[in-house]
Amino acid sequence: MQISNSYLQLGDDFYLPSTPRQPSNPQLFLWNQGLAESLGVADFLAQEQEDPAGFFSGGRLLPNSKPVALAYAGHQFGHFNPRLGDGRAHLLGELRGDTDMVFDVQLKGSGATPFSRGGDGLCGLGPAVREFIMSEAMAALGVPTSRTLAVVTTGDEVYRGDAVPGAVVCRVAASHLRVGTFEYFYAQGNKDAIERLCDYAISRHFPELASSEGPEKYSGFLRAVFSRQVELVCEWLRVGFVHGVMNTDNTTISGETIDYGPCAMISTYNPNTVFSSIDAMGRYRFGHQPSIAHWNMARLTECFLPLLDQDSKQATAIGESLLGEFPQNFEQRYHHMLASKTGVRLQGDSDKALCEDFLQLLRKQGLDYTNSFDSLTRSLIDPQHEDRCASQWPEWYQAWSARIEQQGRPREVVAEGMRRHNPVVIPRNHHMEAVIDECIKNGSPDAAKSWLKVLRRPYQDLPTTPNYQDPPADGDRSYQTFCGT
């Protein structure tokens, strides 16, 4: 295992050196063995006979690690801040995985940095456990996401109103390049830095563009980033995920989900669902996430206008043309996603309407999003669920059944295809809170580990799956989330 530091080659405008805080008594709380093996970390620890807690709490540095805090800006709830940066995170470097992909390794909650703006740079155990569970659940669901290698308790208390146990999260991501990273240099008028950053992003995420040059390269880069955002948000909508804080500093160039602070999962289907306590206007509500992704891509495109054409009017026209492709591409991908969830082969507007009508029924009847699609899937092979669905949605179910029959595929085959898009279990909010509370109360990760066994197989019926399928009694109407990590 060898840590590399390619980001440092971009120059010291891109980061500030920062040493992680020394924890008083680091103890491993949660460990991702599969991820550790894929990164070569498990072999390294075995050979060196080392405890992971020291390395992944900031207490010790991995060989060749040169920790830094990354510089970036960002639009937060629509308002621009020209200097944000990692205020409580340290990039340790990069590791090459078993698929030959390179991944960033970062500590969160590892102490103050030059970007902390007066904060303590620390993290409580609750938000750390949430990040581990959510990122692993999302990965198992098939959603592009950062991962969590470890949660380490520090032995120190963190004050968030009350004293809570401190923890450090070790996050692994395809990179930590953000829309806000480009905005940071655009705000300074640093065209050269944007060019270097784009070349670096291409080398990490879009090597197929490496031979492109000039405006063609930058147009291709923007299209590639747009495509990944379309895919990402469609996946969020597929599983019922509400990010909660889709600021441009949380929008990755890689197209991975990052920052699980105020996130949540919808229960009762309603596009206007919002959980974040700081999102009073509902800017980042469930059904508005595609529009926000488009808005964020507009902010990225602005950074590239000087590179798209020397003439500002022509550059703006090119940028607007590129952005104009986003809604259509999203709409196409979204309808295919929805068709996959309902088992319908899209052949016209009537099929799109059939899929949309199902969502409208769920909203009108105040039904659970995940369990309704699960029941619809089972109705093809289980008479009990068939009777239930036919009773719940008589007209729609009759039309849907006729369409499935008309397609000529065996019901078992359709059900199998639907199952790949409709999970049996998701990381429901009330279970998340209960598990976090139990972990903190008992000082033990057992509750999290038990739940993770189910969440890592979300499309299968396990003996313990029913324990986590029930929706909350009030449909999460009173549930709120808060920024934590």
UniProtKB/Swiss-Prot annotation:
In Pfam terms, one family for this protein is: SelO
The protein in question is named Protein nucleotidyltransferase YdiU
Sites where the protein binds Mg(2+)? 250, 259
Protein family membership: Belongs to the SELO family.
InterPro entries in alphabetical order: SelO (IPR003846)
Q: What keywords does the record list, in alphabetical order?
A: ATP-binding, Magnesium, Manganese, Metal-binding, Nucleotide-binding, Nucleotidyltransferase, Transferase
Q: Which reaction does it catalyse?
A: L-seryl-[protein] + ATP = 3-O-(5'-adenylyl)-L-seryl-[protein] + diphosphate; L-threonyl-[protein] + ATP = 3-O-(5'-adenylyl)-L-threonyl-[protein] + diphosphate; L-tyrosyl-[protein] + ATP = O-(5'-adenylyl)-L-tyrosyl-[protein] + diphosphate; L-histidyl-[protein] + UTP = N(tele)-(5'-uridylyl)-L-histidyl-[protein] + diphosphate
A molecular function annotated in GO for this UniProt entry is: ATP binding
Q: Where does ATP bind?
A: 85, 87-88, 108, 120-121, 171, 178, 259
The prosthetic group or cofactor this protein requires is: Mg(2+); Mn(2+)
Q: Where is this region: Disordered?
A: 462-485
EC annotation? 2.7.7.-, 2.7.7.108
